[in-house]
């Protein structure tokens, strides 16, 4: 847990390491992505994929999902104990797309999980390499964040659909460890906690007995993770109240929803990492790049540089716009689903448009979609500049809250103001300031009211030329201060359904 004891960088969380110096971190992250690359190459050989087919992002996703499923111990155990019709608990598979006679055809493959685990371990020097698995989970999570909206999930837990910018990592599996916890947004943590409290309200044995003790420990741990994301004393104090509650119920749910709303202006610290599809690492390893020797970082220039020299393809449905498909994947690669569009556009060097204006559906193709009309095109994943990823949330100085906009959780450490509609946010805070958290609530509301939309965050931070790998010459962009930059405005995307 980042909030207690030693502070570890999120690369250390990613690689399960204890405190390491920068060189060791770069080497162990390099070892991790190199292992993913080696695994991918081996899988392409097993499946006899051509070079072109191996660069197809849909094939990459199928292969990633197979290895994640092969190592999902909980689910494997569950499947063995509850055999369902037509599902072999020992096998995993998915659609692989091949080019035949100028057409794309779908082939469903099935593999022994044991065999997949063997190939994965072999690619990772015989180890389980959990860090690499988590890395793939975060890439899938970032792709979901860019592709789907979670309105329904928000409404179900009693939250406001406009809080979508707090929902980073909402589709991450529970087994994603410390690295997964670091990238979860405030809203995601709140939602997990509310679900837990609701179960406790409906099932009186939830907190009781041996199981209940474990549940309680999990509850307190999640509270601590969320507390660690808040940056003001009052928000943290409220989290202590929620955590210490004898019998969590509706009062705690109220407090959590209040805290989630407050995070729209007093933003939490949420980590951002550029996690790329397995095929990208595979391409680099195949071309002879030694990740472990060169070192790698998820938050610096490395992912940008990797994407500059990688050609990845995607299947395109008949009425989809390939440029829009590219934008979706670019945002996923850089974990920029909740970033200000002005900043993303500047870094990418082409205009990044809000999702309501994208003519593209998700990257994955459903099994009932017609392959006859499928085409493929190159994804344009290159960028004009690079910038350092942030985990601070961009509050101007730790104690005093800065401005935030409904729907921005900054990804890049780049100077800008964070415009927001104060009236909209503050309207949600009428009424309830009594009860045991009243002084904290009052304090939080006071801080929110003093926040100014024109305050500049990330003072002096800029983007860098791709030739400037040591980040010596920051280029500080100037943005139109009034312009809103939310990706989710006027949204018509599909809901995320498991």
From Swiss-Prot:
Modifications made to the protein after synthesis: Late in virus-infected cells, may be cleaved from a 56-kDa protein to a 53-kDa protein by a cellular caspase. This cleavage might be a marker for the onset of apoptosis in infected cells or have a specific function in virus host interaction.
Motif (Bipartite nuclear localization signal): 198-216
Cellular localization per UniProt: Virion; Host nucleus
Residue window of motif Unconventional nuclear localization signal: 1-18
Keyword Ribonucleoprotein set for record: yes
Pfam families assigned: Flu_NP
One Gene Ontology term from the biological process aspect of the record: viral penetration into host nucleus
Region of interest (Disordered), residue spans: 1-21
Keyword tags: Capsid protein, Helical capsid protein, Host nucleus, Host-virus interaction, Ribonucleoprotein, RNA-binding, Viral nucleoprotein, Viral penetration into host nucleus, Virion, Virus entry into host cell
SUPFAM superfamilies named among the record's database cross-references: flu NP-like
GO-annotated cellular components: helical viral capsid; host cell; host cell nucleus; ribonucleoprotein complex; viral nucleocapsid
Molecular function as annotated in GO: RNA binding; structural molecule activity
Subunit annotation: Homomultimerizes to form the nucleocapsid. May bind host exportin-1/XPO1. Binds to viral genomic RNA. Protein-RNA contacts are mediated by a combination of electrostatic interactions between positively charged residues and the phosphate backbone and planar interactions between aromatic side chains and bases.
UniProt function note: Encapsidates the negative strand viral RNA, protecting it from nucleases. The encapsidated genomic RNA is termed the ribonucleoprotein (RNP) and serves as template for transcription and replication. The RNP needs to be localized in the host nucleus to start an infectious cycle, but is too large to diffuse through the nuclear pore complex. NP comprises at least 2 nuclear localization signals that are responsible for the active RNP import into the nucleus through cellular importin alpha/beta pathway.
Family stated for the protein in its record: Belongs to the influenza viruses nucleoprotein family.
Protein name: Nucleoprotein
């Amino acid at each position: 847990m980042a909030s207690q004891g030693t502070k570890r960088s999120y690369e250390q969380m990613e690689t399960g390491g204890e405190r390491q110096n920068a060189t060791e971190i770069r080497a162990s992250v390099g070892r991790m992505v190199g292992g993913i690359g080696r695994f991918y190459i081996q899988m392409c050989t097993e499946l006899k994929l051509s070079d072109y087919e191996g660069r197809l992002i849909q094939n990459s996703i199928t292969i990633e999902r197979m290895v994640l499923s092969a190592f999902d111990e909980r689910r494997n155990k569950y499947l063995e104990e509850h055999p369902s019709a037509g599902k072999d608990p020992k096998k995993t598979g998915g659609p692989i797309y091949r080019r035949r006679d100028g057409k794309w055809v779908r082939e469903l493959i099935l593999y022994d999980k044991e065999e997949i685990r063997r190939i994965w371990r072999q690619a990772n020097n015989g180890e389980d390499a959990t860090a690499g698995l988590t890395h793939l989970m975060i890439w899938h999570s970032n792709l979901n964040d860019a592709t789907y909206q979670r309105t329904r999930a928000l409404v179900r837990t009693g939250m406001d659909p406009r809080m979508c910018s707090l929902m980073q990592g909402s589709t991450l599996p529970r087994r994603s460890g410390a690295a997964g916890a670091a990238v979860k947004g405030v809203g995601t943590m709140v939602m997990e906690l509310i679900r837990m409290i609701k179960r406790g309200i409906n099932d009186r044995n939830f907190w009781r007995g041996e199981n209940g003790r474990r549940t309680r420990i999990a509850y307190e741990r999640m509270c601590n993770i969320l507390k660690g994301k808040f940056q003001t004393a009052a928000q943290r104090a409220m989290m202590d109240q929620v955590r210490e509650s004898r019998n969590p119920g509706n009062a705690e749910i109220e407090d959590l929803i209040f805290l989630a709303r407050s995070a729209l202006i007093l933003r939490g610290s949420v980590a951002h990492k550029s996690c790329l599809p397995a095929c990208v690492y595979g391409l680099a390893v195949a071309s002879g790049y030694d990740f472990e020797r060169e070192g790698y970082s998820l938050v610096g220039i490395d992912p940008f540089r990797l994407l500059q020299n990688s050609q990845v393809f995607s299947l395109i449905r008949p009425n989809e716009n390939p440029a829009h498909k590219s934008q979706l994947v670019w945002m996923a690669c850089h974990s920029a689903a909740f970033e200000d569009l002005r900043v993303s556009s500047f870094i990418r060097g082409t205009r990044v448009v809000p999702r309501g204006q994208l003519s593209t559906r998700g990257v994955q193709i459903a099994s009932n979609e017609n392959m006859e009309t499928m085409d493929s095109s190159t994804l344009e994943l290159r960028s004009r500049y690079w910038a350092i990823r942030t985990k601070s949330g961009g509050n101007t100085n730790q104690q005093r809250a800065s401005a935030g906009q409904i729907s921005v959780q900054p990804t890049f450490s780049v100077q800008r103001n964070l415009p927001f509609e104060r009236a909209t946010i503050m309207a949600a805070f009428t009424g309830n300031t009594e009860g045991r958290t009243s002084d904290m609530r009052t304090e939080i509301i006071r801080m929110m009211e003093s926040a100014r939309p024109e305050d500049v965050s990330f003072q002096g931070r800029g983007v860098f030329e791709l030739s400037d790998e040591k980040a010596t010459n920051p280029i500080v962009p100037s943005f139109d201060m009034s312009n809103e930059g939310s990706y989710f405005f006027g949204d018509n995307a599909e809901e995320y359904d498991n």
